[in-house]
């Protein structure tokens, strides 16, 4: 019996990839033209180099900090020969305010969640990222008050597909793993992670086409509703 539905957040409940790219472009323009009066290409190159350095340094430990934009912008400024103490938080806040003003929840998602809640099904979030910004996204997307629990990789100390994250969210929800439908866009992190944890995975195809015929998949929330209605 299905007692809970757990969602990945980024690119499952809203478009993260494309809005992130736009926010990066806007932030680079802001830094280049308003703060440092440098060429935009130079600033973008420094940002990309700084981001890659952070990921290279931290990804081996599978830490949420590898996603932290304050570190990306710190490295960017250091590469440009500018003191991060002067501008880092200003740039960080500019980026996230720009990003949050762009995002909107996928059509049908709130209605789907409300319907599941009305049927007594608990709703959780299991997401790689730092907790602070995920709470801000949840508020922006209108999910506050609709969720029963969330686990971030920052809280878990490890990232998906490690089973610890999946076990922690079910513990918070008070359900067993085999009582959960898990919805996420990453085949490796979400689909296989949930499957290996004993959940029923649904691959949310926001960024790619289906390649595994043995996996339930949905391209939108109308399709997800049809799948869930058959499973429960």
Regions found by a protein language model. Name each.
Residues 1-49:
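Active-site neighborhood of HAD-like aspartate-dependent phosphohydrolases
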Residues 1-5, 17-18, 33, 41, ...:
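Asp-based, Mg2+/Mn2+-dependent phosphohydrolase catalytic module
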Residues 22-26, 67-71, 132, 164:
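A generic alpha-helix surface/boundary motif
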Residues 95-102:
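Surface-exposed cleft-lining segments at the edges of enzyme active sites
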Residues 33-46, 79-92, 146:
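Short, surface-exposed acidic
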Residues 49-93:
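A metal-dependent, Asp-based hydrolase signature
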Residues 121-123:
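Short beta-strand/loop segments at the ligand-binding rim of alpha/beta enzyme cores
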